[in-house]
């Protein structure tokens, strides 16, 4: 039986050809290699029909034009040459579309990304809808690749080299208004008239290319170009720390096309695409992509989730305000905040106002839409309006008795089906549910700060939590735009447990005489977004160290922090950025200056700041402890799979994505190498570096955590 075509041709009475894109059986249109023959057959028909006046590409999907190329195609390539051939095939197809003698227009609604935007760029004109779902971008760099079907050559010529570089190097996505302003699209229209607007454009002569702004014309010249690429190269190197080869190749390929012409540019693009596809960085980033896609599809349990119509939040502080924002503005659910103090409610409302007003100022949101979303949030100082809430998220102080009291109050004031979800970061969920009348409806829902930015949540069922409670909480987290992992109710859960030894070791090196900026720079060079000491300042030194005694009580001295260091810092009223006193100096608000260490820290903790370790030695000590603890978490079934362990570390603490997560990284080094490093460190620095039994066993057997396919071991 012949497979239904993803591309179908219909010719209207006015001799405009409509090519409809609709990949059978898929929610998203993605480009596959086998579609090339379908498109070529259509191009042949178009060339043979001399009556045609124009062509329009349009999607039949309700919320996407083309979301990109199918990434599995790259995984199927065994060599750089095979991946290069794939890119050349894409380039050739786009060239054939562009070579049609009549106007070809892309009618864009929804996501137009990667290969989808490259197809749109090959058209002679583009019209898109003003819908918030419509975004245009080239996100290949986030997979360790570059656009391989002509994007690196067409985009700079259309919108200018500096703007194109920003899009390609960051994977930045543009909304409709930004796209038309930059000249990426020719018109923005309501969805209802998209096709007709594209048809009208197709009836005209080919849209003439918009003259580039003077600045872009100067930067395209030899002198301006040399200056631009030097400046962008320096900035990119600082940002990536040399850990992402794709950025360097993007700069090289774009410059080749501008300096030597498009033919050389396309050649360089295809070659670079093939070589990048084989890099360990790209393979790791693609694995993270596949794993996060799997996690988003995981229901958390076998039971069907209960309906979610409205949510309540206890506590209007920083976390409560952030949770209210993602619940109302991302999940679209009515939220009622209870706080004993009206100021707490006002704080939470202002939190959402500030987030939404920022979007209005950046023209990402209409004022009317802001008001509509804010109307979903209300507040109260008692339980008025809580009677029929389906799920209550508790975000009060980390105090067990207080949280137990919250459970009792919710059970008295809410419906019998209401789920109680605690945002605790350190208290056992089983203890919070200890006196509950309905313990099966108590669960942990651990968000990370800042809530609106951090993609991960940990969902923590205790021994009596029902399967439906798990499924419903997972469903809510996904609605909030989060990536949820289900973890076991053990001290520190997963993320904080693997983070604590990493932070502790950084503090220990500080007491040994290593400089703060050296420790942080070493871990940033390794691939973390910020160093461990700066991270403590950002989350709050008091908040970040609160978990340490809990973990030490549960797991012993391997979690003990260097004696008296943390207490000395806290006793000096140093809480980090939030009170302007931490390891670093904080100037006036809004000033963007290079971070400087507060020199008063060293005498305070009795350290000299005269370190002897190299950056790789510093990183090794912090990271090895994190890897060892991650393996222990898998062994104790704190995490359900290595997939969840990798996603939790990358999305929860910024473990370097190009390494693929702790378990992928151990596999890339080899368990034997990790054990050898840890045994050496144990000899040098103490028993906390002793590799766990699972690692030693895997080393002896030559085993790895992941199979060679994209499925995990469990």
From Swiss-Prot:
GO terms for cellular component: cytoplasm. PROSITE patterns: 3HCDH. InterPro entries: 3-OHacyl-CoA_DH_CS, 3-OHacyl-CoA_DH_NAD-bd, 3HC_DH_C, 6-PGluconate_DH-like_C_sf, ClpP/crotonase-like_dom_sf, Enoyl-CoA_hydra/iso, FA_oxidation_alpha_subunit, FadJ. It catalyses: a (3S)-3-hydroxyacyl-CoA = a (2E)-enoyl-CoA + H2O; a 4-saturated-(3S)-3-hydroxyacyl-CoA = a (3E)-enoyl-CoA + H2O; a (3S)-3-hydroxyacyl-CoA + NAD(+) = a 3-oxoacyl-CoA + NADH + H(+); (3S)-3-hydroxybutanoyl-CoA = (3R)-3-hydroxybutanoyl-CoA. The keyword Membrane does not apply. The record marks 118, 140 as: Important for catalytic activity. One of its GO terms (molecular function) is 3-hydroxybutyryl-CoA epimerase activity. Pfam families: 3HCDH (PF00725), 3HCDH_N (PF02737), ECH_1 (PF00378). GO terms for biological process: fatty acid beta-oxidation. It comes from the Bacteria. It is found in: Cytoplasm. Keywords: Cytoplasm, Fatty acid metabolism, Isomerase, Lipid degradation, Lipid metabolism, Lyase, Multifunctional enzyme, NAD, Oxidoreductase. Pathway: Lipid metabolism; fatty acid beta-oxidation. Catalyzes the formation of a hydroxyacyl-CoA by addition of water on enoyl-CoA. Also exhibits 3-hydroxyacyl-CoA epimerase and 3-hydroxyacyl-CoA dehydrogenase activities. In the N-terminal section; belongs to the enoyl-CoA hydratase/isomerase family. This is Fatty acid oxidation complex subunit alpha. The lineage of its organism: Bacteria, Pseudomonadati, Pseudomonadota, Gammaproteobacteria, Enterobacterales. The gene is fadJ.
């Amino acid at each position: 039986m012949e497979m239904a075509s993803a591309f179908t041709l219909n010719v209207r009475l006015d001799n405009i050809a409509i090519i409809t894109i609709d990949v059978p059986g898929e929610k998203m249109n993605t480009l596959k290699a086998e579609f090339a023959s379908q498109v070529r057959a259509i191009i042949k028909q178009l060339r043979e029909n001399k009556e045609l006046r124009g062509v329009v590409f349009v999607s039949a999907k309700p919320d996407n034009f083309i979301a990109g190329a199918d990434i599995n195609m790259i995984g199927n390539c065994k060599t750089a040459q095979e991946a290069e051939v794939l890119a050349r095939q894409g380039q050739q197809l786009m060239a054939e579309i562009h070579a049609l003698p009549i106007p070809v227009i892309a009618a864009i609604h929804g996501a137009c990304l990667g290969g989808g935007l490259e197809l749109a760029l090959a058209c002679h004109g583009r019209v898109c809808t003003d819908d918030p779902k419509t975004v245009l971008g080239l996100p290949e760099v986030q997979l360790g690749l570059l656009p391989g079907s002509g994007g690196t050559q067409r985009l700079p010529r259309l919108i200018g080299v500096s703007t194109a570089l920003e899009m390609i190097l960051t994977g930045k996505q543009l909304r409709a208004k930004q796209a038309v302003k930059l000249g990426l699209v020719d018109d923005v229209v309501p969805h209802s008239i998209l096709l007709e607007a594209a048809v009208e454009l197709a009836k005209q002569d080919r849209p003439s290319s918009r003259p580039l702004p003077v600045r872009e014309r100067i930067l395209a010249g030899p002198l301006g170009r040399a200056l631009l690429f030097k400046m962008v190269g320096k900035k990119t190197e600082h940002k990536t720390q040399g850990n992402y080869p794709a950025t360097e190749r993007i700069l090289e390929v774009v410059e080749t096309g501008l300096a030597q012409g498009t033919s050389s540019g396309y050649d360089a693009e295809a070659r670079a695409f093939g070589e990048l596809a084989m890099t360990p960085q790209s393979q790791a980033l693609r694995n993270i992509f596949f794993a996060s896609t799997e996690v988003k599809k995981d229901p958390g349990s076998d039971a069907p989730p209960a309906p979610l119509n409205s949510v309540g939040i206890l506590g209007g502080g920083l976390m409560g305000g952030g949770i209210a924002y993602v619940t109302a503005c991302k999940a679209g659910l009515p939220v009622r905040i209870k706080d004993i103090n009206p100021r707490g409610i006002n704080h939470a409302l202002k939190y959402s106002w500030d987030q939404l007003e920022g979007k209005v100022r950046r023209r990402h949101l209409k004022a009317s839409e802001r008001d509509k979303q804010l109307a979903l949030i209300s507040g109260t100082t008692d339980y008025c309006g809580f009677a029929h809430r389906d799920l209550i998220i508790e975000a009060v102080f980390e105090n067990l008795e207080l949280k137990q009291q919250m459970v009792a109050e919710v059970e008295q004031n809410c419906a019998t089906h209401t789920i109680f979800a605690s945002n605790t970061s350190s208290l056992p969920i089983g203890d919070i549910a200890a006196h509950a009348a309905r313990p099966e409806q108590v669960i942990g829902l651990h968000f990370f700060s800042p809530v609106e930015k951090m993609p991960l949540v940990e969902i923590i069922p205790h021994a009596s939590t029902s399967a439906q409670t798990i499924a419903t909480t997972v469903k809510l987290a996904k609605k909030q735009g989060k990536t949820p992992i289900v973890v076991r109710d053990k001290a520190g859960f997963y993320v904080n447990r693997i983070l604590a030894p990493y932070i502790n070791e950084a503090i220990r090196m500080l007491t040994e005489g290593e400089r703060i900026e050296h420790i942080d720079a070493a871990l940033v060079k390794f691939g973390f977004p910020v160093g461990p000491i700066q991270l403590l300042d950002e989350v709050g030194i008091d908040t970040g160290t609160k978990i340490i005694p809990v973990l030490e009580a549960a797991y012993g001295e391997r979690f003990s922090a260097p004696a008296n260091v943390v207490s000395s810092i806290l006793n000096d009223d140093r809480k980090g950025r939030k009170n302007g006193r931490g390891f670093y100096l904080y100037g006036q608000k809004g000033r963007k200056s290079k971070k400087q260490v507060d020199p008063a820290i060293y005498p305070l903790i009795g350290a000299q700041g005269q370190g002897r370790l190299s950056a790789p030695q510093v990183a090794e000590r912090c990271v090895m402890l994190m890897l060892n603890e991650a393996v222990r978490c898998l062994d104790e079934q704190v995490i359900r799979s290595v997939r969840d362990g990798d996603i939790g570390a990358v999305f929860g603490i910024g473990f370097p994505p190009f390494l693929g997560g702790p378990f992928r990284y151990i596999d890339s080094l080899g368990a034997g190498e990790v054990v050898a490093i840890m045994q050496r460190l144990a000899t040098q620095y103490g028993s906390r570096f002793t590799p766990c039994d699972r690692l030693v066993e895997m080393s002896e057997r030559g085993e790895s955590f992941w199979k060679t396919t994209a499925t995990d071991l469990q």
